[in-house]
Amino acid sequence: ESLGTGVATHLSQNRNFAGIILETPFTSMIDAAKKFYPYIPVGLLLKDKFENKNKIKNVKSPILIMHGEKDQIVPFEMGQKMFEIANEPKYSYFTKYDNHMMEYDENLIKTLNSFLINLN
C-alpha cells in the first residue's frame, strides 16, 4: 500500500514476476509531498524520490492497480496516472467509495481472484 508501491515498482522493473498488485500507488514522492507541502522545495530534501511514474515503464509483468477516489493521502489521480503509464497487461480496480485504506469487500476480492487466476 502507498509507500510499499514505490518499493514494489522499483523491484519489479528488472524482474519477471508472475504479477504485481499496487494498492494506492503514487507517481513520485515529490508529487505526493507537494500535496501537503506546496511551498517547500521537497525535491531538494528527498534522498530517494521514488520516481514510480518513470520506473513503471520498465515493468513487464501483469499489473493490477487499485485506488479509491476518496483517498486523502495519495490523490486518486496518481493511481489513474500510474495505470495510464503501465504496460499491458494491466488491470485496474478503481472505486468511488474507498479512501486510502481500501475496504476488502466482495468486489475487491473478486477482482483479486480474477487477476490471480489469470496469471501464468
Model regions: which residues?
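Alpha/beta-hydrolase superfamily serine-hydrolase fold, recognizing
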Residues: 36-45, 113
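Acidic catalytic loop of the alpha/beta-hydrolase fold
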Residues: 69-74, 99-102
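Catalytic histidine neighborhood in serine/cysteine hydrolases
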Residues: 80-103
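Active-site nucleophile elbow and catalytic-triad environment of alpha/beta-hydrolase enzymes
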Residues: 41-55, 61
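Primarily recognizes the serine-hydrolase "nucleophile elbow" in alpha/beta-hydrolase
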Residues: 1-37
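Post-His helix in hydrolase/transferase enzymes
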Residues: 103-118
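Short beta-strand/loop motif that positions the catalytic acidic residue
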Residues: 58-60, 64-71
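Short alpha-helix in the alpha/beta-hydrolase fold that links the catalytic acid
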Residues: 52, 61, 75-84, 107-108
